[in-house]
Amino acid sequence: MAQEGGAVEQFGQWLWSNPIEQDPDDEMVDAREEEGQILYLDQQAGLRYSYSQLTTLKPTPPGQSNSAPVYRNAQRFQTEYSSPTIVTRSQVSELSLSHTRPPIRQALSLLSSTPRASNQPWVATLIPSPSARPPPRPSGQRQLMGRNSRNQR
């Protein structure tokens, strides 16, 4: 079991540190890398984030007269939240091909979609919902359901 934990840790380190790779035949159009850190002093915690976006133009194969360009867009967004009691890592990767040039995104716009649970009061608050089940009938009544159903007593 200890070896499994070590292998998972090694894989996590590799996944966290490897950059997005570019196809050597593609022409680079846009590249963006952004890193940052946010400290939450009230919780003795911190959030580290990294965002990479690479857009390349795929070459038209010889003998093909395709006038529409093909863009390859690779994005990776990673976060690591650390507090005295927990460390949470998250990574989202996206690869797409398109005939239109994709927009450049900001890492902070992606951060707003990954809120911390302690800042969201509705996460910790349980709100009872009405039961979908009808209230129990008195024990003397039964209801049959079907084509020719009638109430029986």
UniProtKB/Swiss-Prot annotation:
Keyword S-adenosyl-L-methionine: no
Pfam families according to UniProt: Luteo_Vpg
Entry annotated with the keyword Transport: yes
GO cellular component: host cell nuclear envelope
Subcellular location: Host nucleus envelope
GO biological process: symbiont-mediated suppression of host innate immune response; transport of virus in host, cell to cell
Keywords: Host nucleus, Host-virus interaction, Inhibition of host innate immune response by virus, Suppressor of RNA silencing, Transport, Viral immunoevasion, Viral movement protein
Superkingdom assignment: Viruses
Comp. bias regions, Polar residues: 109-122, 140-153
Swiss-Prot/TrEMBL domain comment: The N-terminus forms a amphiphilic alpha-helix, which partitions into the nuclear membrane.
Job of this protein: Transports viral genome to neighboring plant cells directly through plasmosdesmata, without any budding. The movement protein allows efficient cell to cell propagation, by bypassing the host cell wall barrier. Acts as a suppressor of RNA-mediated gene silencing, also known as post-transcriptional gene silencing (PTGS), a mechanism of plant viral defense that limits the accumulation of viral RNAs.
Family listed: Belongs to the luteoviruses movement protein family.
Protein name: Movement protein
Annotated organism of origin: Barley yellow dwarf virus (isolate PAV) (BYDV)
Lineage, uppermost ranks: Viruses, Riboviria, Orthornavirae, Kitrinoviricota, Tolucaviricetes
